[in-house]
Regions:
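C-terminal catalytic histidine-bearing segment of alpha/beta-hydrolase fold enzymes
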Residues: 24-58, 279-320
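N-terminal cap/lid segment of alpha/beta-hydrolase-fold proteins
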Residues: 52-129
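Short beta-strand element of the alpha/beta-hydrolase
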Residues: 131-140
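Catalytic nucleophile-loop/oxyanion-hole region of alpha/beta-hydrolase
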Residues: 146-150, 166-194, 298-303
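Primarily recognizes the serine-hydrolase "nucleophile elbow" in alpha/beta-hydrolase
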Residues: 177, 181-250
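Short beta-strand/loop motif that positions the catalytic acidic residue
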Residues: 255-257, 261
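Conserved alpha/beta-hydrolase "acid-adjacent" motif
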Residues: 262-268
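Residue-level detector of functionally pivotal "anchor" positions at catalytic/ligand-binding pockets or at interdomain
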Residues: 319-340
Length: 362
């Protein structure tokens, strides 16, 4: 009996050991490593040797438009609701993918001829191979590029949903030319980059929204690239801009803005989308009560979740289906609203219009 007891005890210890191993946390991948925290100095991120020369492009080259010593202290002119945790997440993502996250869109010969071209490029937030791509364009009044709040977070969230997203760093004085070059470069290198050449979207906030709308117009795309073989964007996603030009050649457009925006009037955006809708171009418009200019993803505000709405609009125009489930976590206590069959888990106060038809007001 003693021998049996010993064997049973040994078996129990073995099973307990196996159970303990099974409950051990998974090995953290490189992409999940914490290289930076809220207290990390911005200068340390920019000068991290892993980034090489392009580290200086992570934050605005035009230093007069931003302030702060650490990541949590970052402030950008004309922007509100900057999320320190998202800033840290973006920086850690870039550091984890430092070997392949930055792509030059101009050749070395071109940069030698025009040194200002060294202040350009795209940061690549990878999604699923051969999935559609988006180019995100930050605003900054055509004076600087506020990517850390107005394009990097958008690109990161899109990549989480399986889409390939590029955040463009452009020359403020030659923004349209640089976006045209980025579109051409990505389309020409689609196989190499592992992205679909068709069904892409252009995103932008403020000045970046003007860029997206302008290059989303097929006539402008052909004029600025000098080519007719490039496909037109399947959708343009715009935030807080006073852009008013309307054309039959414009892409389907999603737009959102805050009602307390002192720079870009929500009424101007609504009027433009109504004009596009009258031309038969698909549109979706949202205004958010009380929000000022430059709210970005709108985390913690009534606009939170707008990016998921915009993705669905893009899917509808491109004919694509969702690659991954939405990244937003829905709590049991959240109120669910429906907009034209679209479910939201955030309270959206304001005016919401799809193809010229008002859906609801909160």
């Amino acid at each position: 009996m003693s021998t049996v007891r010993v064997l049973l005890c040994m078996l129990g210890l073995c099973l307990q050991s196996c159970s303990s191993r099974a409950e051990e946390p998974p090995v953290v991948s490189e992409a999940m490593n914490t290289y930076y925290t809220r207290q990390s100095r911005i200068s340390d991120v920019m000068n991290d040797s892993a980034f090489g020369d392009y580290g200086r492009l992570i934050f605005p080259v035009n230093t007069g438009y931003w302030s702060g010593t650490t990541l949590e202290q970052l402030q950008l002119t004309w922007y509100n609701y900057i999320d320190p945790d998202k800033t840290v997440e973006v920086c850690n993502y870039l550091r984890a993918h430092a070997n392949n996250c930055f792509i030059d869109i101009y050749t070395e010969v071109e940069k030698q001829a025009n040194p200002n071209l060294r202040n350009t490029g795209v940061f690549f937030f990878r999604g699923n191979r051969n999935a559609p791509f988006a180019i995100c364009n930050a605003g900054g009044g055509f004076s600087y590029v506020g990517a850390m709040h107005d394009s990097f977070p958008h690109a990161l969230e899109l990549s989480k949903q399986g889409y390939n997203a590029f955040a463009l760093i452009y020359r403020p004085g030659d923004a349209y030319e640089d976006l045209a070059r980025a579109i051409a470069y990505i389309c020409d290198h689609a196989d190499e980059l592992g992205v679909s050449r068709t069904g892409y979207s252009l995103w932008g906030g403020s000045a970046g929204a003007r860029m997206a709308a302008t290059l989303g117009n097929s006539a402008n795309l052909h004029s600025l690239t000098g080519r007719t073989d490039l496909p037109q964007a399947s959708a343009v996603i715009m935030q807080y801009t006073g852009y008013t030009t309307v054309s039959q050649y414009d892409s389907p457009t999603y737009a959102c803005c805050g009602t307390s925006d002192g720079i870009a009037s929500w009424r101007t955006m609504q009027s433009r989308l109504e004009s596009l809708s009258a031309l038969g171009i698909p549109t979706e418009f949202h205004s958010y009560s009380g929000l000022p200019h430059g709210f970005g993803l709108g985390t913690g505000t009534v606009a939170e979740g707008w990016l998921d709405d915009a993705v669905r609009f893009w899917q509808q125009q491109s004919g694509a289906t969702a690659i991954c489930s939405a990244t937003a976590n829905t709590k049991q206590s959240d109120t669910i609203y429906s907009l034209n069959g679209i479910r939201r888990n955030t309270i959206q106060k304001g005016i919401n219009i799809v193809n010229g038809k008002k859906q609801y007001i909160k």
